[in-house]
């Protein structure tokens, strides 16, 4: 599958967040062309401020693969990751992050900060932006 097809999967995941009145953001984690984790925002559903789509997709991928280092993974997110999610993506050693829309209020991949490619951190993610934005 290509970036457009995988972002469509993330968008479908985002729509599921509307079922429980959450912000419609979706994320899909892929390794070797196979989806290993997908999620949507569940902050309202779980009453959990950390239940962002990217974090939940990383957790699902780590469980599926049986490891926390996701150095061969690409994560597709419908919106630019926030500081918490960007930090989680770096901590998981994600190889590449692809996102759709920028987030001028909380974007931590380009708009406000560049956590994903900060050379002071222990890992830098490759980045592709604006897919299906």
Spell out what each predicted region is.
Residues 67-79:
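Immediate flanking context of iron-sulfur cluster ligation sites
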Residues 45-56:
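A short, polar/charged loop-to-alpha-helix boundary motif
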Residues 1-17, 32, 81-84, 88-133:
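Zinc-dependent deaminase
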Residues 10, 14-17, 27, 37, ...:
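Small-residue (primarily alanine) positions within well-ordered alpha-helices
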Residues 36-43:
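Short beta->alpha transition motifs characteristic of CBS
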Residues 31-32, 59, 71:
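A cytosolic small-molecule/anion-sensing beta-strand core signal
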Residues 21-25, 71:
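Short, basic and Ser/Thr-rich N-terminal targeting/leader segments
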Residues 25-33:
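Short beta-strand scaffold segments in enzyme catalytic cores
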